Structure formats: structure tokens, C-alpha cells
């Protein structure tokens, strides 16, 4: 049985947030098409994960060197391990998030920091880093109110680009991406943009 991991990084309600609506649409469609799949859903805002900083990093370093960890470091390392192992064990993963202030919400950055561990999702080699998680099937769902397709705006899109860059670093070079954009910039076409985007979400979910 396939293990599927759904990761949502938006705590706003679906009636107000397009990426939340994308997430709900994908999960509902996928469950209908795959009733026997083992599914785990992570709501990153609800989890309130501790920031990835000195305690977790020092704990990981000490463990790798066979040094004794403090109780605080043990707890931080165990938290990182929990989510890292969960990700590694998943056959399929879906990320859903908005673009806020040109990038992803902070909880997703924290979560990705947990996952980006040398020897687990990538390794160092003489020729540079090499990804270790390339066997996964991944979908990226992103929403942004402005249209970032122009030459001027594209460099400012650091949400989907950030996530897909990190995935590529881990060896996941072909994630399927569905983006809904411009629904705030083009209010006269907002409903159409969102509806067409959600139809694309359903199509991807049905065959995921």
C-alpha cells in the first residue's frame, strides 16, 4: 500500500485562501480515487514546529560525533527525526502553500529545514551535493494573487521556485506543479482563474 503525505502551509480558511482550497480539492479528489491508500495530513501551522536553529543543529552535530546531548537537544533532534523519517517513508508527497511576501510561509521553511539533512535527503560528494530522495512522486500546489509570468515579475517568485529548487537538491527533479495566479490582479476574471485552476488540481489528483 502506498504511503501518501499531504503537507499544507496555510492556516487561512478555504473560502478566503486559494491555496487552502487547492489543498482541500486535491485531498478530496485523491481520497475518492484511492480509498485504500495510507494517508497522512500535516497542517504545519497547527503543528507549531520549533524553529530549526542552534539547539537542533548542535544536537545533530553532537550525535554524529558520538557526543552526549542535553535533554533539550535530544528533544529537538527527535522532532527533526520524526518528520524527516515520515517524509522519507512516503511514496508520494503533496505540498500546498501560498506566496506571501514573495516566498513561502515561515512554517514551511522550518519544515523543509527539518528535511534537508546530509546523509538523508542529500549527500556531499567530490563533484558536489547529490540528492538521495529521488524515488518519490511529488506534487506542488501554489497560489499567488499577482501574475508572476512576466519577465519583470518572474524573479520575485520565490515560493514555488524555492520549493522546487530544494526538491531538486534532494534529487526530486520532476515534481508536478499546479499554480493558480493573478486572481487578485485580474478581479474581472478572478472566478474563472480559480475555477480553471481547481479543475487542473482535480485532474492531477485523480491520476496521482
Swiss-Prot record:
GO molecular function: electron transfer activity; FMN binding; oxidoreductase activity, acting on NAD(P)H as acceptor; oxidoreductase activity, acting on NAD(P)H, quinone or similar compound as acceptor
Keywords, comma-separated and alphabetical: Flavoprotein, FMN, NAD, Oxidoreductase
EC number assigned by the record: 1.6.5.-, 1.7.1.17
Pfam families: Flavodoxin_2
Cofactor: FMN
UniProt catalytic activity: 2 a quinone + NADH + H(+) = 2 a 1,4-benzosemiquinone + NAD(+); N,N-dimethyl-1,4-phenylenediamine + anthranilate + 2 NAD(+) = 2-(4-dimethylaminophenyl)diazenylbenzoate + 2 NADH + 2 H(+)
Top-level EC class: oxidoreductase
Keyword NAD listed: yes
InterPro entries listed in its UniProt record: Flavodoxin_fold, Flavoprotein-like_sf, FMN-dep_NADH:Q_OxRdtase_AzoR1, NADH:quinone_OxRdtase_FMN_depd
Cofactor note: Binds 1 FMN per subunit.
Keyword Flavoprotein: yes
Annotated family: Belongs to the azoreductase type 1 family.
Subunit structure and binding partners: Homodimer.
Function according to Swiss-Prot or TrEMBL: Quinone reductase that provides resistance to thiol-specific stress caused by electrophilic quinones. Also exhibits azoreductase activity. Catalyzes the reductive cleavage of the azo bond in aromatic azo compounds to the corresponding amines.
Protein name, as recorded: FMN-dependent NADH:quinone oxidoreductase 2
Native source species: Bacillus anthracis
Gene this chain is encoded by: azoR2
Amino acid at each position: 500500500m502506498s504511503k501518501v503525505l499531504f503537507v499544507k502551509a496555510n492556516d487561512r480558511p478555504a473560502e478566503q485562501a486559494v491555496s487552502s482550497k487547492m489543498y482541500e480539492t486535491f485531498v478530496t479528489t485523491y481520497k475518492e480515487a484511492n480509498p485504500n491508500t495510507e494517508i497522512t495530513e500535516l497542517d504545519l501551522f497547527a503543528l507549531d514546529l520549533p524553529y530549526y536553529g542552534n539547539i537542533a543543529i548542535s544536537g545533530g552535530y553532537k550525535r554524529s560525533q558520538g557526543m552526549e546531548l542535553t535533554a533539550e537537544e535530544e528533544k529537538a533532534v527527535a522532532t527533526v527525526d520524526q518528520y524527516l523519517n515520515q517524509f522519507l517513508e512516503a511514496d508520494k508527497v503533496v505540498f500546498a502553500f501560498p506566496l506571501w511576501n514573495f516566498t513561502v510561509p515561515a512554517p514551511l521553511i522550518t519544515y523543509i529545514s527539518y528535511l534537508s539533512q546530509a546523509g538523508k535527503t542529500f549527500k556531499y560528494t567530490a563533484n558536489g551535493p547529490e540528492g538521495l530522495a529521488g524515488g518519490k512522486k511529488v506534487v506542488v500546489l501554489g497560489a499567488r494573487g499577482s501574475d508572476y509570468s512576466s519577465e519583470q515579475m518572474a524573479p520575485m517568485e520565490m515560493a514555488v521556485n524555492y520549493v522546487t529548487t530544494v526538491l531538486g537538491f534532494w534529487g526530486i527533479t520532476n515534481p508536478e506543479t499546479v499554480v493558480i495566479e493573478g486572481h487578485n490582479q485580474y478581479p474581472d476574471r478572478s472566478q474563472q482563474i480559480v475555477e480553471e485552476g481547481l479543475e487542473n488540481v482535480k485532474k492531477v489528483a485523480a491520476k496521482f
